[in-house]
């Protein structure tokens, strides 16, 4: 009887522990990207497409990861002036309106249901 009571207690403890592990939020188990070393070279802004800041408490260093036009991630020190200038330049590019192609709809004279589309270039304001 003592053996079955002990086994029952162990089983209950195992079930309680496993449900606690399964109830953890997904973010706890999600992978974190960290930079352990930084580039020693200044990267031309012309080669850069985007960036993201890394400031997770799980990472040893705060960093910026630049994505190049060739889809390569490069870790950089956010305290360096060229990194701050590149971030400002990329932010400015994102705010600058670009030329967009839109389509104007012209109704055909024979029927009201059909339409033809002709591309026209416009600039957003």
Curated annotation (Swiss-Prot):
GO terms for biological process: antimicrobial humoral immune response mediated by antimicrobial peptide; chemokine-mediated signaling pathway; eosinophil chemotaxis; inflammatory response; positive regulation of cell migration; positive regulation of synaptic transmission, glutamatergic; sensory perception of pain. Residues 1-23 form the signal peptide. The keyword Ribonucleoprotein does not apply. Residues 97-109 have a biased composition (Polar residues). Its main location: secreted. It comes from the Eukaryota. It is found in: Secreted. CDD domains: Chemokine_CC (cd00272). Glycans are attached at residues 40, 55, 112. One of its GO terms (cellular component) is extracellular space. PROSITE patterns: SMALL_CYTOKINES_CC. Residues 97-125 are annotated as: Disordered. Residues 110-125 have a biased composition (Low complexity). Disulfide bonds join 34-59, 35-75. GO terms for molecular function: CCR chemokine receptor binding; chemokine activity. Keywords: Chemotaxis, Cytokine, Disulfide bond, Glycoprotein, Inflammatory response, Pyrrolidone carboxylic acid, Secreted, Signal. InterPro entries: Chemokine_b/g/d, Chemokine_CC_CS, Chemokine_IL8-like_dom, Interleukin_8-like_sf. The modification Pyrrolidone carboxylic acid is found at residue 24. Processing at the N-terminus can regulate receptor and target cell selectivity. Deletion of the N-terminal residue converts it from an activator of basophil to an eosinophil chemoattractant. Pfam families: IL8. Monomer or homodimer; in equilibrium. Is tethered on endothelial cells by glycosaminoglycan (GAG) side chains of proteoglycans. Interacts with TNFAIP6 (via Link domain). Acts as a ligand for C-C chemokine receptor CCR2. Signals through binding and activation of CCR2 and induces a strong chemotactic response and mobilization of intracellular calcium ions. Exhibits a chemotactic activity for monocytes and basophils but not neutrophils or eosinophils. Plays an important role in mediating peripheral nerve injury-induced neuropathic pain. Increases NMDA-mediated synaptic transmission in both dopamine D1 and D2 receptor-containing neurons, which may be caused by MAPK/ERK-dependent phosphorylation of GRIN2B/NMDAR2B. Belongs to the intercrine beta (chemokine CC) family. This is C-C motif chemokine 2. It comes from Oryctolagus cuniculus (Rabbit). The lineage of its organism: Eukaryota, Metazoa, Chordata, Craniata, Vertebrata. The gene is CCL2.
């Amino acid at each position: 009887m003592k053996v079955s009571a002990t086994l029952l207690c162990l089983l209950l403890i195992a079930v309680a522990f496993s449900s606690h592990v399964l109830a953890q939020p997904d973010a706890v188990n999600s992978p974190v990207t960290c930079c352990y070393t930084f580039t020693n070279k200044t990267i031309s802004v012309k080669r850069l497409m985007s960036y993201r800041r890394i400031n997770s408490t799980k990472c040893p260093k705060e960093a910026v990861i630049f994505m190049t036009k060739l889809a390569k991630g490069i870790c950089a020190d956010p305290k360096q002036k060229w990194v701050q200038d590149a971030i400002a330049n990329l932010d400015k590019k994102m705010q600058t309106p670009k030329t967009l192609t839109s389509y104007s709809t012209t109704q055909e004279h024979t029927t009201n249901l059909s339409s033809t589309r002709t591309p026209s270039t416009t600039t957003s304001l």
